[in-house]
Amino acid sequence: KLKKEINNLSKATHREITKSRQHFLILHLPSTYRDIMNMGITDDYTMGYAMEIGFRASTSRSFLFYDLEMEYTTALRVHPFAVMEGTLRDYQQMNVEQALIAYKNIIDEVKAVNGTYISLWHTESVSDKNRWVGWRELYEKMIDYALS
């Protein structure tokens, strides 16, 4: 099924699909990574927490996935993310102002180690509708802060 979805997306976009993020951040290691590598995926952006801020792999830098069962370094590059907007709003019950402080804190931590800052945002959260009013502006402020 996933291979078919990758092929359909590739046809629709006229691009080779090489990047992935698993829905709900569900990873079954090592099988998820083995499966997506077999389908031509070279980069994955699933490595992060749903309910917490921080790095699930203890690093802010991308790395090649090491398959412990097979005892070898694969060609799959894992890109850990620092925080998901839903973590702050839904799990940690932060408002926009509190979330901006949290984003700035993690950005500062990543900058201090010369790491790569990646955050996960969903299209709904930048719509500025319903429960996400104010989060689009927060997104823009977060980007500005990360780039400063």
Where are the regions that the model predicts?
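Glycine-rich phosphate-binding "P-loop"
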Residues: 1
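Active-site-adjacent pocket scaffolds in enzyme catalytic domains
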Residues: 7-110
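C-terminal domain-boundary segment and adjacent tail
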Residues: 10-12, 97-148
